[in-house]
Amino acid sequence: MTSIEELIKQIKSYNSNADFDLIKKSYNYGFNAHKGQYRASGEIYFTHPVEVAKILIDLKLDESTIKTALLHDTIEDTSRSLKQLELAFGKEVSQLVDGVTKLTNLELSSLETKHAENFRKLFMAMSKDVRVLLVKLADRLHNMRTIKALPIDKQIRKSKETMEIFAPLAGRMGMQFMREELEDLSFRVLNSEARNSIIRRFITL
C-alpha cells in the first residue's frame, strides 16, 4: 500500500501549499477506521481509499478532494459518523463524503437504456459539487481494476452498471481516458471471448 509520505510527495509536485498535516490526519483516520477490514482480494481494505486518492492525485485535484477520497467509505463501512468527520475535518470534507455516500446508496432498478439515462441524471442532480462525482468515478475505476476478485455474478452486475452508468458519466465530464478504461474493463468481463478475438485479429494483421 502506498505510504502517506509518497502521497504527499506526489501532491507537492502540483500543490505545495496544501495542508499536509490534515492530509496525513485523514490518511491515519481512514486507516484506523477500516482496521480489521479486508477486500475480496485479501488486501487490507484501506488499500482501496488510497488507490482512489492516487487516481485523483494524478488528476491534480485539490486537497479537500484527496481527503474525501481517503475518507469516502468511513460513513458507509465503519462506525464513524458524519458529525465525527465534520469535527475532525470540517464541513467541506464531511459534506463531500456525505455526497459520495448518498451516491453509493443509490441502487440501479433497471439496466434498460432509458432507466440508465434517468439514473445518470439523478447522479448529476444529487451531486451539487462536481468533486463528489469525481471521487465516485475514481472509486468505481479502482473497483473495476480489481473486479476479478469478486464472484462472476457480481463481476457481471458491476460491469453492466459501469457500462451503462459510470462510463457515460465520465464521458460527459470530459474524462475520456477514464471512460475508455471503464468501458474496456467492463468489456473484459461481459464479452471476454469477443474481446480476445478482436485482439487476435489485430495481432495477425
Predicted regions and their residues:
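Active-site helical microenvironments for divalent-metal-assisted chemistry
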Residues: 1-205
